[in-house]
A protein has these predicted regions:
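Active-site nucleophile elbow and catalytic-triad environment of alpha/beta-hydrolase enzymes
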Residues: 202-220, 226
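Conserved alpha/beta-hydrolase
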Residues: 67-84
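Conserved alpha/beta-hydrolase "acid-adjacent" motif
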Residues: 237-243
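Hydrolase active-site cap/lid region
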Residues: 130-210, 231-232
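The serine-hydrolase catalytic nucleophile loop
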Residues: 53-65
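Alpha/beta-hydrolase active-site loop
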Residues: 59, 89-113, 122, 126
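Short beta-strand/loop motif that positions the catalytic acidic residue
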Residues: 224-225, 230-232, 236
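N-terminal cap/lid segment of alpha/beta-hydrolase-fold proteins
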Residues: 2-41
Length: 251
C-alpha cells in the first residue's frame, strides 16, 4: 500500500499473471510518450527487468526511476522463487525462459530487451538462450554460477576444496551436519542458506546445493546470440571478477 501511494500519478499498473498453479506478480510502467517519440530507430519498445536473490518487483521497478529517459515500457516481475511468488509457495526453477515467456505472452510482447539485477544477471542469460523474443541483454552485473556466492568469501586456497564439495554434495548427511554448524560462525552464510531454503522450498543444505548447481552459464555456451552488455565489479562480494572470462567464453 505504501509503495502504491508513493507511485500515485505514475502510469504504473499491477498485474497477476497465471503461471503453473499460481500467479506471478508483475508491474508495468508505460513509456514516456515524449521520450519514445525522440528515441533512435531500433530502440526496444519494452524492457523486462528480472529480479534478484531476495528482491521484489516493487524494488526493481523503482530502480528504473533513475533512468535518464524512458522511451520503452518497463515490466518487472517476480518469477518462481522470488518476491511475492516465493511467499505464495512457488519454488525457484532453472528454466527461466518459461516464466519469461509467460510474462511476454500476457502483455502481448513480441520482442523485448531484458535486464537482470544481481542473480538476475544469470537469469537474464538463461532466458536469452532459450527465448528468442529477448532482443538485447543487460547483466547488472554478471553471474556465471550461483554457487560462487558461497565460495567467494572463503580464502583462495580453500575455494577449490569448497567447489569440489558443493559440486558433489555427498555424503549428504555429512554436508547437512557441517552446514548446520557453519552458519553459527558466519551471519552471511546463515542468511544465504536461509534465503536459499525460502527460494527453493527445500529444507536440507545438501538438497539446496544440488538444486543450485543447475544455475550456471556453462551449458549456455553458444546459445546466446543477442547483443549483451555485461557489467562486473572488481570487489563484488558474491561474484568473482575473474568469472568475466568465463562469461565472455559463454557468449
Amino acid at each position: 500500500a505504501a509503495f502504491d501511494e508513493a507511485c500515485h500519478g505514475l502510469v504504473l499498473t499491477r498485474h497477476a499473471i497465471p503461471y503453473r498453479d499460481g500467479e506471478l506478480t508483475a508491474m508495468r510502467w508505460e513509456a514516456d510518450p515524449a521520450d519514445r517519440a525522440q528515441a533512435p530507430a531500433g530502440t526496444p519498445h519494452t524492457l523486462v527487468m528480472m529480479n534478484e536473490f531476495d528482491g521484489y518487483a516493487e524494488e526493481i521497478i523503482d530502480f528504473a526511476s533513475y533512468f535518464p529517459t524512458r522511451p520503452f515500457d518497463i515490466i518487472a516481475f517476480d518469477g518462481p522463487g522470488q518476491g511475492h511468488a516465493a511467499l505464495s509457495g512457488m519454488a525457484l526453477e532453472p528454466e527461466w525462459e518459461r516464466p519469461t515467456s509467460a510474462v511476454l505472452d500476457y502483455f502481448g510482447v513480441e520482442s523485448a530487451a531484458a535486464l537482470g539485477v544481481s542473480f538476475g544477471g544469470y537469469l537474464v542469460m538463461r532466458a536469452a538462450a532459450h527465448c528468442p523474443r529477448v532482443s538485447h541483454v543487460i547483466a547488472f552485473d554478471m553471474m556465471y554460477r550461483l554457487l560462487d556466492g558461497l565460495t567467494l568469501p572463503l580464502p583462495c586456497p580453500l575455494r577449490p576444496i569448497a567447489d569440489a564439495v558443493i559440486g558433489n554434495p555427498r555424503p549428504a548427511w555429512l554436508i547437512d551436519a557441517a552446514l548446520r554448524i557453519a552458519p553459527r560462525f558466519s551471519a552471511d552464510l546463515a542468511w544465504k542458506l536461509q534465503q536459499a531454503r525460502h527460494l527453493t522450498g527445500l529444507s536440507k543444505p545438501s538438497e539446496v546445493l544440488r538444486a543450485f548447481g543447475d544455475y550456471t552459464m556453462e551449458p549456455l555456451e553458444g546459445l546466446i546470440h543477442q547483443p549483451c552488455l555485461v557489467l562486473a565489479g572488481d570487489a563484488d562480494q558474491y561474484v568473482p571478477f575473474e568469472r568475466l572470462e568465463d562469461v565472455r567464453r559463454a557468449l
